[in-house]
Amino acid sequence: LVNSKIEKTITEGICFHVEVQDLDFDFINDLDWVIILGNVLDNAIEAAAETDTKFLFCGIIKDNDFLTILIKNSCKSQIINIENLYQSGHTTKGDGHGIGLFNARKILSQYPDILHNTNCNNNYFLQQLKLPETFTSKGKRVNISAV
């Protein structure tokens, strides 16, 4: 997934920094993982491509008792109404769009212990997911360090 996004950033002329530790993601359904990360990265690439800075960072790291997934990209807007982004049908792209982040949030609701934070500040958009070392995945307790 990340490799295909790297190719897209090269095509768009985006400076893409990636920091991914060798981690096992068996605790999240593969399709859920692809939908969440794919939508967030696609939106980040599209937003970064519209800026002069053209910057994107993707970090997936285990730090202390958390697995942290961080996506940060340049964007044109200083301030974005974050709640609107997650409404079904909300889009800046035209017809046939506006379900990606809505679906991502719906999937994330199945993992109640995943902390999801979205922020826009100083022309940078940030999405952060934090998974505690032990959390609930679709009704089952999972320990990341045991995965």
Where would I find each of the regions flagged by the language model?
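Short beta-to-alpha transition helix within the HATPase_c
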Residues: 1-12
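Conserved short strand/loop->alpha-helix "switch" segment adjacent to the catalytic nucleotide/phosphoryl-transfer site
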Residues: 16-37
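Conserved ATP-binding N-box helix of the HATPase_c
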Residues: 30-52, 110
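Glycine-rich nucleotide-binding loop
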Residues: 98, 120-128, 134-135
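Heptad-repeat coiled-coil segments of the DHp/HisKA dimerization-phosphoacceptor module
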Residues: 18-22, 62, 75, 120
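Short beta-strand/loop element within the Bergerat-fold HATPase_c
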Residues: 51, 55-65
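Conserved glycine-/histidine-rich ATP-lid loop and adjacent helix of the Bergerat-fold HATPase_c
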Residues: 103-115
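Glycine-rich/acidic phosphate-handling loop/turn and adjacent ATP-lid/helix
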Residues: 67-98, 142
